Amino acid sequence: CSYIAVMVITTKLNYHFQYVRGWNAQMSGLILIITPIIMAIMAPNAGKLSDRIHPQKLAAIGMAIATVAMLILTFLTRDTPLYLVVVAMILQGFGMGLFSSPNMNAIMSSVPPKDAPTASASQATMRTIGQTMSLGLLTLVFAWVMGSLELAPQYASMIVQASQTICLICTVACVLAVFASLVGIRSSDKFNTEK
C-alpha cells in the first residue's frame, strides 16, 4: 500500500504542476524533489531510531503521517495555495522516510538469519509491484475520467478530478497500511511474550 501511494503522488503532482498550474517541466521537477530529499534525510535516522523503538510502531506513525499528506492532496485544486502542496510533500517525505527503514527492520528482524535473503528479496519485490500497480491505477483512473483525451491544460478540471479520485483511493490504501502495521505490532508483541 505504501509504495502505491508514493509513486502516485509524484506522477499526479507532476501532471498537476504542468497541466493544471501551467508550469514547465524544469519548475515541476525542482519542486518535486522536496519529497525525496526529506525521505533521504529521514530514512537513515528512522533506521537508527528503530533499533531503540519498536520498528512497527515507527512504521505505523510514518504511514499515518503519509496518510495525512495524501488526505491533504485529495482536496488539491487549481486554487490550492502552493504552501499547502509543499506541506503535503514534506509530510509525505517525512512519513515515508519514517516508514521505510523501520518497516525493513521489522521484516528482517522477524525472520531467522538463514531466511534474510528471501525476506529482503520479497520486500523488494513487493515494493516494485506496488510501484508498478500505482502507475497502472493512475492510468486506469485517468482513462476512466478523461477517456481518450490527452493530458493538456484545456482539460485541467478533468485532471483535477482524476487526481482527487486517485488520492482518495490511495488514502484508503494508506489507512489499510497503518492498520496492517498496528496488527503487526500486536502480533509481534504476542510472539515475543510467547518466546
Name every feature range the model reports, one short phrase each.
Residues 152-153, 188-195:
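Short, Lys/Arg-enriched, Gly/Pro-containing loop segments at transmembrane-helix junctions
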Residues 1-147, 159-188:
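12-transmembrane solute porter fold
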